[in-house]
Amino acid sequence: LMARMDNSGRNGDLLKRAKAKGATTTVDVFAGSPDDMGDVAGVLPHTDYFMPSIEEARALTGLTDAGDVARTFLDLGVNCCVLTLGADGAYYHHRDGTRFTVPAYQIKVRCTCGCGDAFNAGFAVGLVKGFDPETIVRFAQATSALNATGLGSQAGVQSFEHTLNFMKTTPVRG
């Protein structure tokens, strides 16, 4: 979601229609300040999974703590907030009270271009495959980590099976 791409509410309308048809909705955002919150807030009530980076979420809310940031978005209507934390992993906070942090994998980073998009793609795959929430986030983390091992967006991502094997064989940080 980029404010310059839609300041007329069309994104919110699209998500509302998708939800009415039974779709699961995910939203990522490109935002730089609390001034962008008005545009973002219009889509949140129609969002199942809101997945900004911690930097984007902090810029929107002015808050620093991941739990506080996530609760702000839950209060604005999302069902679940998943914050990517870079080298610190990812934080999952669902409206039902489920919350956890998944650590990042130990990798040699070559390029972080597209890591957020790779995380979101891995998350969507996990949803479609019916994984439990923690496995979904771990799979998303693995997809993002593999992306970072290559030079350029998606260079390190090979296949679903390769990503599952990476999850099983690669240690996590911390």
Predicted feature residues:
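Conserved beta-alpha-beta core of the PfkB/ribokinase-like small-molecule kinase fold
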Residues: 1-71, 89-90
